[in-house]
From Swiss-Prot:
One matching Pfam family: Rer1
Domain of life: Eukaryota
Protein localization: Membrane
Name of the protein in its database record: Protein rer1
Membrane spanning residue stretches: 34-54, 56-76, 137-157
Family as reported in the entry's similarity comment: Belongs to the RER1 family.
Gene for this chain: rer1
Organism: Schizosaccharomyces pombe (strain 972 / ATCC 24843) (Fission yeast)
Keywords, comma-separated and alphabetical: Membrane, Transmembrane, Transmembrane helix
One term under GO cellular component: Golgi membrane
InterPro entries given in the database record: Rer1
Length: 184
Protein backbone atom coordinates (compact mmCIF):
# COMPACT_ATOMS: atom_id res chain seq x y z
CA UNK A 1 0.00 0.00 0.00
CA UNK A 2 2.83 2.38 0.85
CA UNK A 3 4.46 1.65 -2.52
CA UNK A 4 1.26 2.65 -4.35
CA UNK A 5 1.00 5.91 -2.40
CA UNK A 6 4.64 6.77 -3.15
CA UNK A 7 4.06 5.99 -6.82
CA UNK A 8 0.94 8.21 -6.89
CA UNK A 9 2.86 11.03 -5.14
CA UNK A 10 5.70 10.65 -7.65
CA UNK A 11 3.28 10.87 -10.59
CA UNK A 12 1.65 13.97 -9.07
CA UNK A 13 5.05 15.64 -8.59
CA UNK A 14 6.02 14.95 -12.20
CA UNK A 15 2.67 16.26 -13.42
CA UNK A 16 3.04 19.44 -11.34
CA UNK A 17 6.59 19.91 -12.64
CA UNK A 18 5.41 19.49 -16.24
CA UNK A 19 2.57 21.99 -15.71
CA UNK A 20 4.96 24.54 -14.13
CA UNK A 21 7.45 24.09 -16.97
CA UNK A 22 4.69 24.50 -19.57
CA UNK A 23 3.38 27.67 -17.83
CA UNK A 24 6.94 29.01 -17.63
CA UNK A 25 7.46 28.70 -21.38
CA UNK A 26 4.03 30.11 -22.19
CA UNK A 27 4.65 33.06 -19.88
CA UNK A 28 8.01 33.73 -21.54
CA UNK A 29 6.22 34.34 -24.85
CA UNK A 30 4.16 37.26 -23.50
CA UNK A 31 6.48 40.09 -24.67
CA UNK A 32 6.84 38.65 -28.18
CA UNK A 33 3.42 39.56 -29.58
CA UNK A 34 4.44 39.69 -33.23
CA UNK A 35 6.21 36.32 -33.13
CA UNK A 36 3.30 34.71 -31.29
CA UNK A 37 0.84 35.85 -33.95
CA UNK A 38 3.17 34.87 -36.77
CA UNK A 39 3.34 31.39 -35.23
CA UNK A 40 -0.45 31.10 -35.01
CA UNK A 41 -0.82 32.41 -38.57
CA UNK A 42 1.69 29.84 -39.78
CA UNK A 43 -0.13 27.04 -37.97
CA UNK A 44 -3.48 28.13 -39.40
CA UNK A 45 -1.94 28.30 -42.89
CA UNK A 46 -0.41 24.84 -42.38
CA UNK A 47 -3.79 23.51 -41.26
CA UNK A 48 -5.62 24.99 -44.27
CA UNK A 49 -2.96 23.66 -46.66
CA UNK A 50 -3.41 20.22 -45.11
CA UNK A 51 -7.19 20.46 -45.54
CA UNK A 52 -6.81 21.49 -49.19
CA UNK A 53 -4.29 18.74 -49.95
CA UNK A 54 -6.14 15.85 -48.30
CA UNK A 55 -9.58 17.13 -49.36
CA UNK A 56 -11.29 16.20 -46.15
CA UNK A 57 -12.00 17.22 -42.57
CA UNK A 58 -14.15 20.14 -43.71
CA UNK A 59 -16.23 19.99 -40.51
CA UNK A 60 -13.06 20.39 -38.43
CA UNK A 61 -12.04 23.33 -40.61
CA UNK A 62 -15.50 24.92 -40.31
CA UNK A 63 -15.52 24.43 -36.54
CA UNK A 64 -12.09 26.04 -36.21
CA UNK A 65 -13.16 28.98 -38.38
CA UNK A 66 -16.33 29.56 -36.34
CA UNK A 67 -14.37 29.34 -33.08
CA UNK A 68 -11.73 31.81 -34.33
CA UNK A 69 -14.51 34.17 -35.47
CA UNK A 70 -16.08 33.95 -32.01
CA UNK A 71 -12.72 34.71 -30.36
CA UNK A 72 -12.10 37.65 -32.68
CA UNK A 73 -15.52 39.15 -31.95
CA UNK A 74 -14.90 38.77 -28.21
CA UNK A 75 -11.55 40.50 -28.75
CA UNK A 76 -13.27 43.44 -30.47
CA UNK A 77 -16.04 43.76 -27.90
CA UNK A 78 -15.61 46.00 -24.85
CA UNK A 79 -15.67 44.32 -21.45
CA UNK A 80 -18.26 46.77 -20.20
CA UNK A 81 -21.05 47.07 -22.75
CA UNK A 82 -21.84 50.75 -23.50
CA UNK A 83 -25.47 49.88 -24.27
CA UNK A 84 -25.95 48.66 -20.68
CA UNK A 85 -24.22 51.78 -19.35
CA UNK A 86 -26.47 53.96 -21.53
CA UNK A 87 -29.58 52.20 -20.19
CA UNK A 88 -28.38 52.80 -16.62
CA UNK A 89 -27.77 56.50 -17.37
CA UNK A 90 -31.24 56.83 -18.87
CA UNK A 91 -32.72 55.21 -15.78
CA UNK A 92 -30.78 57.61 -13.51
CA UNK A 93 -32.09 60.60 -15.47
CA UNK A 94 -35.66 59.36 -15.04
CA UNK A 95 -35.09 58.91 -11.30
CA UNK A 96 -33.62 62.39 -10.92
CA UNK A 97 -30.14 61.39 -9.70
CA UNK A 98 -27.39 64.01 -9.96
CA UNK A 99 -24.78 63.37 -12.67
CA UNK A 100 -21.50 61.96 -11.36
CA UNK A 101 -19.38 62.05 -14.51
CA UNK A 102 -19.00 63.96 -17.74
CA UNK A 103 -19.83 62.45 -21.11
CA UNK A 104 -16.44 63.51 -22.49
CA UNK A 105 -14.56 61.73 -19.72
CA UNK A 106 -11.72 59.48 -20.89
CA UNK A 107 -12.61 55.82 -20.61
CA UNK A 108 -9.98 53.31 -21.72
CA UNK A 109 -11.04 50.50 -24.01
CA UNK A 110 -10.91 47.28 -22.02
CA UNK A 111 -11.45 44.17 -24.10
CA UNK A 112 -13.78 41.35 -23.18
CA UNK A 113 -11.06 38.93 -24.33
CA UNK A 114 -7.48 40.17 -23.77
CA UNK A 115 -4.95 39.76 -26.56
CA UNK A 116 -2.89 37.07 -24.81
CA UNK A 117 -5.95 34.92 -24.07
CA UNK A 118 -7.07 35.42 -27.67
CA UNK A 119 -3.70 34.19 -28.90
CA UNK A 120 -3.55 31.32 -26.42
CA UNK A 121 -7.05 30.08 -27.28
CA UNK A 122 -6.36 30.42 -31.02
CA UNK A 123 -3.13 28.46 -30.67
CA UNK A 124 -4.75 25.65 -28.68
CA UNK A 125 -7.73 25.42 -31.05
CA UNK A 126 -5.51 25.35 -34.13
CA UNK A 127 -3.28 22.65 -32.66
CA UNK A 128 -6.34 20.64 -31.66
CA UNK A 129 -7.81 20.98 -35.17
CA UNK A 130 -4.48 20.01 -36.73
CA UNK A 131 -4.29 16.88 -34.57
CA UNK A 132 -7.97 16.06 -35.25
CA UNK A 133 -7.29 16.21 -38.99
CA UNK A 134 -5.15 13.07 -38.67
CA UNK A 135 -8.00 10.88 -37.41
CA UNK A 136 -10.57 9.48 -39.85
CA UNK A 137 -13.34 9.63 -37.24
CA UNK A 138 -13.42 13.43 -37.62
CA UNK A 139 -13.64 13.26 -41.42
CA UNK A 140 -17.41 13.59 -41.71
CA UNK A 141 -18.57 13.66 -45.36
CA UNK A 142 -20.17 17.02 -46.08
CA UNK A 143 -20.70 19.26 -49.08
CA UNK A 144 -18.06 21.89 -48.27
CA UNK A 145 -19.43 24.82 -50.38
CA UNK A 146 -22.44 24.97 -48.04
CA UNK A 147 -20.10 25.35 -45.07
CA UNK A 148 -18.25 28.17 -46.83
CA UNK A 149 -21.53 29.98 -47.55
CA UNK A 150 -22.70 29.47 -43.94
CA UNK A 151 -19.42 30.87 -42.65
CA UNK A 152 -19.47 33.89 -44.96
CA UNK A 153 -23.09 34.74 -44.08
CA UNK A 154 -22.42 34.33 -40.37
CA UNK A 155 -19.29 36.49 -40.61
CA UNK A 156 -21.15 39.18 -42.54
CA UNK A 157 -23.95 39.47 -39.99
CA UNK A 158 -21.63 39.31 -36.97
CA UNK A 159 -19.27 41.96 -38.33
CA UNK A 160 -22.13 44.18 -39.42
CA UNK A 161 -23.58 44.06 -35.91
CA UNK A 162 -20.16 44.71 -34.36
CA UNK A 163 -19.44 47.69 -36.64
CA UNK A 164 -22.88 49.17 -35.95
CA UNK A 165 -22.22 48.81 -32.22
CA UNK A 166 -18.81 50.50 -32.61
CA UNK A 167 -20.32 53.40 -34.56
CA UNK A 168 -23.27 53.84 -32.22
CA UNK A 169 -21.14 54.01 -29.06
CA UNK A 170 -18.10 55.62 -30.72
CA UNK A 171 -15.30 53.32 -29.69
CA UNK A 172 -12.34 51.98 -31.60
CA UNK A 173 -11.00 48.62 -30.41
CA UNK A 174 -7.63 49.06 -32.12
CA UNK A 175 -4.74 51.15 -30.86
CA UNK A 176 -3.31 51.96 -34.28
CA UNK A 177 -2.33 55.63 -34.34
CA UNK A 178 -2.88 56.16 -30.62
CA UNK A 179 -0.11 57.61 -28.48
CA UNK A 180 1.97 55.09 -26.57
CA UNK A 181 3.70 56.05 -23.38
CA UNK A 182 6.47 54.27 -21.56
CA UNK A 183 9.37 52.27 -22.93
CA UNK A 184 7.67 51.22 -26.19
Amino acid sequence: MEFIQRHIENVKEKKNFAVRLYRHWVDRTIPYTTYRWLTVSGLIALFFIRILLVRGWYIVCYTLAIYLLNLFLAFLTPKFDPSVEQAMKDEEIEEGVLPTSKDDEFRPFIRRLPEFKFWYSSMRATLFALVASFFRIFDVPVFWPILVVYYLVLSFFCFRRQIQHMLKYRYVPFDIGKKKFGSH
